[in-house]
Regions:
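Transmembrane alpha-helix signature in integral membrane proteins
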Residues: 53-81, 196
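Intracellular coupling helices
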Residues: 158-170, 178-182
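Cytoplasmic-entry segments and transmembrane alpha-helices of multi-pass inner-membrane transporters
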Residues: 20, 78-114, 142, 147-159, ...
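Interhelical loop and adjacent transmembrane-helix boundary motif
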Residues: 215-229
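N-terminal, non-cleaved signal-anchor transmembrane helix
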Residues: 1-62
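Membrane-interfacial helix termini and adjacent extracytoplasmic/periplasmic loops
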Residues: 40, 108-149
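Alpha-helical membrane-interface segments at transmembrane helix boundaries
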Residues: 54-62, 96-100, 189, 193, ...
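Transmembrane alpha-helices
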Residues: 176-210
Length: 229
């Protein structure tokens, strides 16, 4: 993070910035490979818990990316619908904004009872891992949190497309579907990708809290360390 921030402040060109960052990462990897950091306590701790660490990293990434993909699959169509229906937009964005005000640990806790009841009512879901604790409430909470940036950025991106551009496409004989696929979405894509990037950063941080409800991830090490102090 420090290296990335420093490169940004230097105002280098994109190619030079990527090259400098690659050199920095190569130096860190070389130092790790040669054992330069082996005497540090964090490296000793890693060697003792290497298998557990690898498993929790995989679970952390699965929770973060799994909820992201689900949010993209739902958020993009919902954003398109909100763009077309202004009255629906106000209600949907208002509800998603309200969800963002709920603390993550509180939302994780609120989902435990409904999901536990759902697993009892529908045994098939319980057999496939849905329960009041574990990954299920974590994925649902992360999914709900992820919807606002994706839906909002989709609406903003589509709204920023120039009406003159859309009119030109109409004059060329484009249908409504063609205007959406070939004109509006490509022009709105940078804004939509910004929303997805925000969600990914947000999810990676929030997954840490999931360890409190048995969701696993790197948060398990965080709370283990807190418990030992």
């Amino acid at each position: 993070l420090l290296a990335t921030d420093a490169l940004t402040r230097l105002r280098l060109r994109p190619v030079a910035r990527v090259g400098c960052l690659a050199l920095f990462l190569a130096a860190v990897v070389a130092a790790l490979a040669t054992g330069y950091f082996d005497d540090l306590s964090i490296m000793r701790e890693y060697r003792v818990n290497a298998a557990t660490f690898g498993r929790e990293v995989q679970r952390h990434l699965w929770l973060a990316f799994g909820s992201l993909f689900a949010a993209v699959a739902v958020g993009l169509p919902l954003g398109l619908l909100c763009h077309r229906e202004p009255r629906l937009r106000a209600g949907v964005l208002g509800a998603l904004n309200f969800v963002q005000t709920v603390p993550s640990i509180a939302l994780f806790g609120l989902l435990m009872a409904p999901l536990a009841a759902l697993a009892v009512a529908v045994p098939w879901l319980g057999e496939h891992g849905v329960s009041g604790i574990g990954a299920a409430p974590a994925v649902v909470a992360l999914f709900v949190y992820a919807l606002l940036p994706i839906v909002a950025n989709t609406v903003v991106g589509l709204s920023q497309v120039s009406p003159a551009t859309v009119d030109a496409a109409t004059g060329m004989g484009f249908t409504a579907g063609q205007r959406l696929r070939q004109v509006k979405l490509p022009l709105a894509l940078p804004t939509i990708l910004t929303g997805i990037r925000i969600v990914l950063v947000q999810n990676i941080g929030l997954v840490t809290i999931a360890a409190l409800i048995g969701g696993g991830g790197l948060g398990a090490f965080v709370f283990q360390g807190i418990g030992q102090t």
